[in-house]
């Protein structure tokens, strides 16, 4: 299982490189220095690594690969669209603003914006702990996700292998 997630990590590096190059070609220019930009890509890599464990558990829990793809989409879709990734949260109803505020995707997006030297436009909940500390919150979320999903995935894998 660890080999699979490390393989996903290699694929994520290729994807991050392609995204960075594509962004640069279309006009994205980070305003921070090379160290901060590298940290931003490292941060994205680590978040992807943590989330790959969610995918591993989903993949082990279902019997069919198409079901695994759909189940992963069902898990990721709300997290992405209930975040500040595509638009500020100010247009959301108040209850959804608070969901978006504490969403791991929102803190990751805000943290990466800071690392790349871009303005952190967190949205309507600016001034809250997640909006003021997106890097710290992202690290906390990554640790929690891995602390939950690595043992569950390994256990599920071992149970399946022992059948």
Residue ranges and their predicted role:
Residues 1, 5, 67, 91, ...:
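Residue-level recognition of oxygen-bearing side chains
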Residues 2-72, 133-153:
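Alpha-helical transmembrane segments and their short interhelical loops
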Residues 4-5, 9, 77, 100-104:
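Transmembrane helix-bundle signature of multi-pass membrane transporters/permeases
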Residues 73-82:
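Small-residue-rich segments of transmembrane alpha-helices in multi-pass membrane proteins
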Residues 81, 86-126, 136:
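Short hydrophobic, aromatic-rich alpha-helical segments embedded in or entering the lipid bilayer
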Residues 116, 120-123, 129-163:
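Junction motif at the cytosolic side of a transmembrane helix
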